[in-house]
């Protein structure tokens, strides 16, 4: 049912109170799962891992629901996208499309929402190198999740800085969209 509706939960990793939701699709799901494993191993962070089959369908149904509610105010149920992502769990959406694709559902996300996408100029390289350049690789997903949790106060200040050093990532490098 979720496949057709636009998103479905693949798995939950861990059962702790510190939790992140990770969204991905297609080949990026491998990186999302790796990030979830690393977050659990290194920080004890639990993850919901979701496959998004269509941000467009989630948006269409969300907009359709909003229209229905305008015309029928007695409707009280939430749209599917809100039932999936409307709580306060911080969410990181990773896409090998431009970030405006996952941003289509931002209005229905309840908590902090970080989007990683391939904005910028076209390039030619290996898949691994391109994912690293566009910051949609496993390292970038882990850092985005840690950043969301640090901003929420779940992780102590300085956790992102430590993780950037551990992963040898340079925050001063050129912005991919520049």
Identify the residue ranges that each predicted region occupies.
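Thiamine diphosphate
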Residues: 1-178
């Amino acid at each position: 049912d979720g496949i057709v509706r636009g998103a479905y939960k693949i798995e939950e990793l861990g059962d702790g109170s510190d939790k992140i939701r990770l969204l991905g699709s297609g080949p990026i799901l491998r990186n999302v799962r790796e990030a979830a494993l690393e977050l659990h191993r290194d920080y004890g962070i639990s993850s919901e891992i979701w496959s998004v089959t269509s941000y467009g369908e989630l948006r269409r149904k969300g907009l359709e629901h909003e229209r229905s509610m305008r015309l029928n105010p007695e409707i009280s149920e939430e749209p599917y996208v809100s039932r999936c992502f409307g709580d306060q769990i911080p969410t990181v959406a990773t896409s090998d499309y431009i970030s405006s694709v996952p941003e289509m559902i931002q209005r229905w996300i309840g908590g902090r929402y970080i989007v990683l996408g391939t904005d910028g100029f076209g390039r030619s390289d290996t898949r691994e190198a391109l994912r690293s350049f566009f910051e949609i690789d496993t390292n970038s997903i882990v850092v985005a999740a840690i950043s969301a949790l640090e901003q929420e106060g779940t992780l102590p200040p300085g956790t992102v800085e430590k993780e950037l050093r551990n992963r040898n990532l340079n925050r001063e490098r050129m912005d991919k969209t520049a």
